[in-house]
Amino acid sequence: MPLSRLSIQWKITLLTGLCLLCIVSLLVGLSLLRMNHDAQLIKAANADMLKDAAKARMQARSEQQAEIIQRFFTDVYLFGNQFSRQVAQLREQTTRHGVDAASVRKDLNQLVRDGLKSNPNLLSLYVVFQPDALDGQDASFHDQADAGSNEKGRFGAYWAQKASGEMTGLAVTEEMIADTSAMLDGSPFNTWQLCPLQTRKACVLNPYFDSASGTKVLMTTVTLPLIDQGKVIAVIGIDISLSRLQQLAVDGDRQLYDGAGSVSIVSPAGLLAGYS
């Protein structure tokens, strides 16, 4: 039926229906658009929540691993601190009680050896006094390595041990003490002595290579000053193989998403000390 022949009532009804259809279509379209927008917001919010949860877990695990590594170095420091007290007590036998200097030096040398033997995880242990700071009798002990004394008589007992348990000892020479050749981080080799002497605090050296134990090993050193009457009279050093830190990194990686990630242990100078 032609539109012109429709009554005014039908025309109004059709026009109203078309308007309602357009409105409904518009509302449905807006609703679908809003639903899609809300879905995107929910998806983004969930992704952020999952990301934040993963970051929080990673942070907690990294702090846990950092505590394990810190505990490792703390144990070394505590051992060194206790050992330094034993060294101080032996020194007092000469300075206060008049015990024979030769006996004290041999006892100190044996103390270093025994201290290392009781800690199989350590590579080496040493005590190096300042000139004449032990007993004022360095001149009487030139080249007496069995008494822990070097070519000038300075006491500098050094003991190293291999994985087999074999132990070797030597007297730290003046050349070793004065060695300023650059290590991996550019610092002088004798930083082991300079750092505690200058800072009067315990020091942890950046990773470096050393072959004093018979094989070339990547290692680090914890050194402590022995202080008497406000002066540093000796340096105590503890050498640690970085294979131990490497194992800590591997263990940490296994506990983090079943080894799907990686763990790096980096020194303050940016040198890699352990990686998995």
Residues of each region from the PLM?
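Solvent-exposed, extracytoplasmic
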Residues: 107-115, 235, 239-276
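Short, small/polar residue-rich loop motifs at catalytic or cofactor-binding pockets
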Residues: 215-220, 257-260
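A short, hydrophobic, proline-anchored segment that marks a local hinge/packing element in signaling
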Residues: 220-230
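Stable alpha-helical elements in mature extracytoplasmic
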Residues: 104-108, 121, 188-192, 245-248
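Extracellular/periplasmic ligand-sensing ectodomains of membrane signal-transduction proteins
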Residues: 116-201, 207-214, 272-276
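Short, Lys/Arg-rich, polar N-terminal cytosolic tail immediately upstream
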Residues: 1-5
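Amphipathic alpha-helical bundle/coiled-coil segments
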Residues: 55, 70, 186-190, 239, ...
